[in-house]
């Protein structure tokens, strides 16, 4: 009699994904972030579901309903801060996951990579709409500024913005629809994750050497289930430390002031995880140009597989490319810092230089250095 694990129509799908999946024997902790993102998504959906039971998506009561959750609902404060800081953990894991893909050449699995880019866009859209829901000052003005960017689209821009707003300004209709989409999108993301994994399991995982590991694979369980479990423990400990000791560390104090359309905050800025893109947007004086640069700052990832000129897949044995990669990381940290600064000298010029360098590294320097390394290795 065959094992139910291998014969049951549903269980065998789980078995082939989580138990008997052949995995490379040498994947490092950088491969933990995929499962950590799954945990983050689970935490966000669960905490979000319970928050939605007490939240009201109405301009008159939204801010007070969030206060009510924190003060009056049993353990409402921990739900709210787990959800807010869980988003930060989500993005930390996301950026490390994408960075891992860039460093080790995982982008050569093009279907998995492209679905990943779509997932990144979907998570960013969800996070943006979630930030609007507490209806504080930064929620309102962030929504106004970011949705207004669509007005830069020629001919249809203004109509498009008013269509999204549901009126002539960010108001009740906007808040209600943002809540609806913020609730819906995580489930669409969960479905996209399934497709992401489906494509990944078609080819199998990459590994730090970038060399096919078919001849040296080990079963996912127990080796990587226990390794993932340790990752979960570390991440949840970090999240709980943040939530229980300094829950407002990454938030904006302006969002503790109820939304007021008549009073603009001195510095409108998004959450920290969008600051690098916001800095790129602000570094271009033209509105349409800024919007295009903003979209391209993420969309540029889609052409990375086409720009892979090295004869090696991974950067493990390419020290010059490694230097360039870490320059890109430093550059992104610089952009994140600039995004949170006021628009004045010297921040403007630093932001412009960092923005140019960001696209230069990905589009020009990486492919050229890879060709040079091929020659140095006489390949």
Swiss-Prot record:
Protein name per its UniProtKB record: Cytochrome b
Source species: Miniopterus fuliginosus (Japanese long-fingered bat)
Entry's transmembrane regions: 33-53, 77-98, 113-133, 178-198, 226-246, 288-308, 320-340, 347-367
UniProt superkingdom: Eukaryota
Binding site for a ubiquinone: 201
Subunit (UniProt): The cytochrome bc1 complex contains 11 subunits: 3 respiratory subunits (MT-CYB, CYC1 and UQCRFS1), 2 core proteins (UQCRC1 and UQCRC2) and 6 low-molecular weight proteins (UQCRH/QCR6, UQCRB/QCR7, UQCRQ/QCR8, UQCR10/QCR9, UQCR11/QCR10 and a cleavage product of UQCRFS1). This cytochrome bc1 complex then forms a dimer.
GO terms for biological process, alphabetical: mitochondrial electron transport, ubiquinol to cytochrome c
Gene: MT-CYB
Keyword set includes Mitochondrion: yes
Similarity comment: family membership: Belongs to the cytochrome b family.
Other information: Heme 1 (or BL or b562) is low-potential and absorbs at about 562 nm, and heme 2 (or BH or b566) is high-potential and absorbs at about 566 nm.
Gene Ontology CC annotations of this record: mitochondrial inner membrane; respiratory chain complex III
Compartments it resides in: Mitochondrion inner membrane
Alphabetized PROSITE patterns for the sequence: CYTB_CTER, CYTB_NTER
Binding site for heme b b566: 97, 196
Cofactor details (free text): Binds 2 heme b groups non-covalently.
Function comment: Component of the ubiquinol-cytochrome c reductase complex (complex III or cytochrome b-c1 complex) that is part of the mitochondrial respiratory chain. The b-c1 complex mediates electron transfer from ubiquinol to cytochrome c. Contributes to the generation of a proton gradient across the mitochondrial membrane that is then used for ATP synthesis.
Cofactor: heme b
Pfam families noted in UniProt: Cytochrom_B_C, Cytochrome_B
Keyword Iron: yes
Keywords carried by this UniProt record: Electron transport, Heme, Iron, Membrane, Metal-binding, Mitochondrion, Mitochondrion inner membrane, Respiratory chain, Transmembrane, Transmembrane helix, Transport, Ubiquinone
Annotated positions binding heme b b562: 83, 182
Membrane topology, record value: Multi-pass membrane protein
MF terms in GO: metal ion binding; ubiquinol-cytochrome-c reductase activity
């Amino acid at each position: 009699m065959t094992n139910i694990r291998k014969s049951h129509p549903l269980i065998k799908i789980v078995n082939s994904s989580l138990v008997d999946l052949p995995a490379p024997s040498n994947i490092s902790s950088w491969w933990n972030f995929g499962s950590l993102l799954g945990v983050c998504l689970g935490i966000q959906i669960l905490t979000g579901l319970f928050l939605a039971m007490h939240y009201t998506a109405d301009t008159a009561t939204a801010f007070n309903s969030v206060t009510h959750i924190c003060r009056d609902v049993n353990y409402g404060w921990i739900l709210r801060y787990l959800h807010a800081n869980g988003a930060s953990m989500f993005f930390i894991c996301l950026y490390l996951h994408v960075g891992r893909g860039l460093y080790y050449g995982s982008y050569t699995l093009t279907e998995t990579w492209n679905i990943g880019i779509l997932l990144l866009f979907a998570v960013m859209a969800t996070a943006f709409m979630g930030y609007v829901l507490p209806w504080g000052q930064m929620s309102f003005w962030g929504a106004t500024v970011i949705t207004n960017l669509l007005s830069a689209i020629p001919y249809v821009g203004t109509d498009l913005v008013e269509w999204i707003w549901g009126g002539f300004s960010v108001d009740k209709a906007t808040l209600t629809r943002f809540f609806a989409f913020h609730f819906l999108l995580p489930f669409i993301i969960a479905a996209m994750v399934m497709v992401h994994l489906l494509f990944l399991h078609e080819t199998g995982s990459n590994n730090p050497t970038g060399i096919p590991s078919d001849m040296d694979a080990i079963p996912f369980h127990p080796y990587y289930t226990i390794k993932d479990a340790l990752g979960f423990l570390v991440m949840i400990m970090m999240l709980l430390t943040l939530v229980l000791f300094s829950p407002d560390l990454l938030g904006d104090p302006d969002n503790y002031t109820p939304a007021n359309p008549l009073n603009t905050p001195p510095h409108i800025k998004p959450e920290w995880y969008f600051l690098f893109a916001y800095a790129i947007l602000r570094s271009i004086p033209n509105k349409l140009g800024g919007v295009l640069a903003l979209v391209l700052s993420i969309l540029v990832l889609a052409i990375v597989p086409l720009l892979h000129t090295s004869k090696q897949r991974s950067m493990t044995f390419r020290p010059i490319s490694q230097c360039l990669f870490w320059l890109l990381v430093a550059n992104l940290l610089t952009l994140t810092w600039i995004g949170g600064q006021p628009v004045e000298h010297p921040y403007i010029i630093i932001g412009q230089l960092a923005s140019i360098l960001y696209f230069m590294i990905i589009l020009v320097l990486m492919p050229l250095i890879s060709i040079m390394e091929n020659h140095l290795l006489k390949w």
